[in-house]
Swiss-Prot record:
Identification of the protein by name: Probable methionine-R-sulfoxide reductase B
UniProt superkingdom: Eukaryota
Family annotation (SUPFAM superfamilies): Mss4-like
Cofactor(s) the record lists: Zn(2+)
Protein's UniProt keywords contain Metal-binding: yes
Active site residues according to the UniProt entry: 140 (nucleophile)
BP-aspect Gene Ontology terms: protein repair; response to oxidative stress
Organism: Caenorhabditis elegans
Length: 152
């Protein structure tokens, strides 16, 4: 089963219909405007089931933005097939301009979590096993945390 690809206008801040700093949005407000799976992953640091994300096999030209707030995260040029079960990118927009890295020692592992710098949504993790010809990094991102804006 593949998860749905959401449009920015259907979820997140745009649905709140108020001008607000994304970091000031209360969890109850996020819960009211995000589908359950998006809320679980983005706001509760969950993980979507591997190989089910709508962007795992998606390779159109464009950009990927945070589903919660619309901040630009990745360009399609940085996307590659990693076979890990989630969309993989070799670099983020502007060298983590809209991403925060956090040490994650949950589940008995040592990883680096990536979150949206604008709204603090959990996006996924970054690993050092990406393509050596680019950055050597692999951003492993949950599809449900992103929207896609096609390049014309």
């Amino acid at each position: 089963m593949t998860t749905k690809k959401f449009r920015m206008e259907d979820v997140g801040l745009s649905k709140l219909k108020v001008e607000k700093n994304p970091k000031d949005v209360k969890q109850t407000e996020w819960k009211s405007v995000l589908p359950n799976e998006v809320y679980r992953v983005a706001r509760e640091s969950g993980t979507e089931t591997p190989h089910t994300g709508g962007f795992n096999d998606h390779f159109e030209k464009g950009r990927y933005v945070c589903l919660c707030c619309g901040s630009e995260l990745f360009n399609s040029d940085a996307k590659f097939w990693a076979g890990c079960g989630w969309p993989a990118f070799s670099e983020s927009v502007g060298q983590d301009a809209n991403i925060v890295r956090i040490v994650d020692r949950s589940h008995g592992m040592h990883r680096t979590e990536v979150r949206c710098k604008t709204c603090d949504a959990h996006l996924g993790h970054v690993f050092n096993d990406g393509p050596k010809e680019t950055t050597g990094e692999r951003y492993c991102i949950n599809s449900v945390c992103m929207a896609f804006e096609k390049k014309d």
